Regions:
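Rossmann-like NAD(P)(H) cofactor-binding subdomain of soluble oxidoreductases
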Residues: 81-132
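NAD(P)+-binding Rossmann beta1-loop-alpha1 motif at the extreme N-terminus of oxidoreductases
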Residues: 1-63
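Glycine-rich, N-terminal phosphate-binding loop of Rossmann-like dinucleotide-binding domains
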Residues: 69-71, 96, 148
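Interdomain hinge/lid region at the active-site interface
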Residues: 207-263
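Rossmann-like NAD(P)-binding element
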Residues: 56-91
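Internal alpha-helical scaffold of NAD(P)-dependent oxidoreductase catalytic cores
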Residues: 136-223
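Residues at the starts of beta-strands that form the adenosine-phosphate
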Residues: 4, 29, 116, 143, ...
Length: 263
């Protein structure tokens, strides 16, 4: 489907994307762009990529597909660096968990090429991070939400949908603002609560004793607190409005339960 694919960011999401493309025979040459030479060396050793470059414009040169998988807060800087190397017909998409902020950043960074940008969010992941955790089956039977705008080229949107379908994902379309609201309530808020509970208990003087006797329910609820804190810091910050709204609704619910218990 794609002669040359450039993947910017080779962590779990980017690495799994590379592995899935290879598994399905959807890419001729896979190139990675990353800040760290060690990350690129690891990608080569794992067989995820064929080439790597720390120069992002060079990494995307000649690519007909570019997948950006970096922290949301770094997206504009990354897109600005790679933009000079984009070919006119290159399809650009991303794996960011927040869409409104990413779209605003892409509009500023990509200029005329913004029409070829198809914003996406694969609803898949693990507690483990890094390219060594890459899984070719990560996206199979999982939802991928695409949030094209009125400025998105229809042919680019069609190719983006076909790409994720070929990988094995269930593809949905949604308005960016609605995506951010829904994900704040179903994903961002649960992570925030898990982080908060673990942090609250860890600050107690007898925290070792508390965690020693934590049963299965506690482990199930707090499992996601082991997720990458840097990534989640970015998500909370970039989707702060929707997250704060969701947190307010949850606080109202907690207040109702507190009053019911007191009564």
């Amino acid at each position: 489907m794609f002669r040359r694919v450039a993947i910017i960011g080779l962590g779990l999401i980017g690495g799994s994307f590379a592995a899935a493309l290879r598994r399905q025979g959807l890419a001729g040459t896979v190139v990675a762009g990353a800040r760290s030479a060690r990350t690129l060396e690891q990608g080569l050793a794992l067989g995820l990529i064929d080439e790597g470059s720390q120069d992002l414009a060079l990494a995307v040169r000649g690519a007909d597909l570019v997948f950006v998988s970096t922290p949301v807060s770094a997206m504009e800087t990354v897109l600005t660096k790679l933009a000079p190397g984009l070919s006119d017909r290159a399809l650009v998409t991303d794996g960011g968990s927040v869409k409104t902020a990413v779209i605003d950043q892409a509009r500023r960074a990509l200029g005329a090429h913004f029409a070829r940008f198809v914003p996406g969010h694969p609803i898949a992941g693990k507690e483990k991070s890094g390219g060594e955790a890459a899984d070719a089956e990560l996206y199979r039977r999982h939802r991928v939400i695409l949030t094209p705008t009125a400025d998105t080229d229809p042919e680019a949107a069609r190719r983006g949908r076909a790409l994720w379908t070929a990988i094995g994902a269930e593809v949905l379309s949604m308005a960016p603002e609605h995506h951010d609201q829904v994900l704040a309530e179903t994903s961002h808020l649960p992570h925030l609560l898990a982080f908060s509970l673990v942090d609250t208990l860890a600050r107690q003087g007898d925290s070792t004793e508390i965690f020693r006797y934590a049963a299965g329910g506690f482990r199930d609820f707090t499992r996601i607190a082991g997720s990458d804190p840097v990534m989640w810091h970015d998500i909370f910050r970039e989707n702060r409005g929707a997250v704060l709204d969701a947190l307010g609704l949850f606080r109202d619910g907690i207040d109702r339960f507190q009053r019911a218990i007191e009564d």
